[in-house]
């Protein structure tokens, strides 16, 4: 029998899950956890029935292409948990996958906790009704989300964001540059995304922007953290024909962000990481045209990047779809590099944001799960 079932959908969920699993094991050293997990959660002691990267698809078109496999995995993992009957289940992000699973487990009497609310405040707010059916307790990472669930009558706890606890309030840029053996001069980080589909869409775009930046700043250096060997391979293919001082770093996104002056970042958790590292950035994103059309019809907010959403303002530029051109990204990055006053204002905004999210999230999550695990 397992004590806790878990499902994390991609690299960011794997990182979030690893932190709170480690916190839980301080009080429950023999805690048995199993489910869909990535390498960091496995390292924390989770038995991976399936690897997280099997779920790492995004957008309507991509999901449709992978739908048979996703449905098969969800059916198998649902049967597994119904048979094993864990004391509780925690779904980490991946709402479209997890809510159906959670609804079936909750209906069978297994408490379901969901960690990281979907962005119902940005689009598809009607999902709150599905969440009410599926989730016994919602754990939210942003302070404004708590009231949304309170108003809907869904038990909720604001736990803060684990990344705000892990990332130092004052990152050591000099140490990171020394660790990467970078010379003096501007450093630009390129973060095209953790999913292979994102890397395929954004890598060449960012590299072309980097070429333009390098033309203006010949002493500039570029770092690109790759989430996997496959991602590094895609970047290598995108680099063909380009002459650029680029370092591809395997899985070192935090070191890259600590070292850089400015970042080009695909929308997602990495934008929050960049803000927590107090780095001015340019946010970009491309999806297939049909996906973009459907998402725009349902959008509620003018921003897509987490730093802007949290600040309720365009603190950093966003370049999406048609506006996501190498020229635009390069010009926006150069504007950051050339304006120290603007950089300082953004850094101060990021510092305020960091303090609001720094809540010792792993301990708060462990505390919220404690009633389900008292005798584990």
What are these regions (language model features)?
Residues 1-376:
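Nucleotide-activated sugar donor-binding and catalytic core shared by glycosyltransferases
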């Amino acid at each position: 029998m397992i004590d806790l079932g878990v499902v994390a959908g991609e690299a960011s969920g794997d990182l979030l899950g690893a932190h709170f699993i480690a916190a839980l094991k301080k009080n429950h050293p023999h805690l048995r956890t199993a489910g869909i997990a990535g390498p960091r959660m496995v390292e924390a002691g989770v038995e991976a029935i399936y690897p997280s990267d099997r779920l790492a698809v995004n957008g309507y078109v991509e999901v449709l292409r992978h739908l048979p496999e996703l449905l098969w995995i969800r059916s198998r993992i649902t049967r597994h948990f119904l048979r094993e009957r864990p004391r509780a289940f925690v779904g980490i992000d991946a709402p479209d996958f997890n809510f159906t699973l959670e609804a079936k487990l909750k209906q069978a009497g297994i408490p379901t906790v969901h960690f990281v609310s979907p962005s119902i405040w940005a689009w598809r707010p009607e999902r709150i009704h599905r969440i009410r059916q599926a989730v016994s307790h919602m754990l939210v990472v942003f302070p404004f989300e708590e009231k949304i669930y309170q108003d809907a009558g869904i038990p909720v706890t604001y736990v803060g964001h684990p990344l705000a606890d892990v990332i130092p309030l004052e990152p050591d840029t000099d140490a990171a540059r020394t660790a990467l053996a970078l010379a003096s001069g501007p450093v630009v980080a390129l973060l095209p995304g953790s999913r292979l589909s994102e890397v395929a869409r954004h890598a060449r775009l960012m590299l072309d922007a980097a070429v333009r930046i390098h033309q203006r700043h010949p002493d500039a250096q570029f770092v690109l953290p790759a989430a996997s060997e496959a991602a590094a391979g895609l970047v290598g293919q995108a680099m063909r024909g380009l002459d650029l001082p680029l370092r591809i770093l395997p899985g070192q996104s935090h070191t890259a962000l600590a070292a850089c002056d400015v970042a080009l970042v695909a929308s997602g958790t990495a934008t929050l990481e960049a803000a927590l590292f107090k780095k001015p950035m340019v946010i970009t994103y491309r999806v297939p045209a049909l996906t973009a059309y459907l998402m725009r019809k349902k959008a509620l907010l003018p921003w897509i990047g987490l730093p802007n959403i949290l600040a309720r303002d365009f603190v950093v530029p966003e370049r999406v779809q048609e506006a996501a051109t190498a020229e635009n990204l390069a010009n926006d990055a150069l504007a950051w590099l050339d304006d120290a006053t603007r950089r300082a204002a953004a850094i101060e905004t990021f510092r305020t944001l960091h303090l609001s999210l720094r809540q010792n999230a792993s301990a708060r999550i462990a505390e919220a799960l404690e009633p389900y695990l008292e005798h584990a």
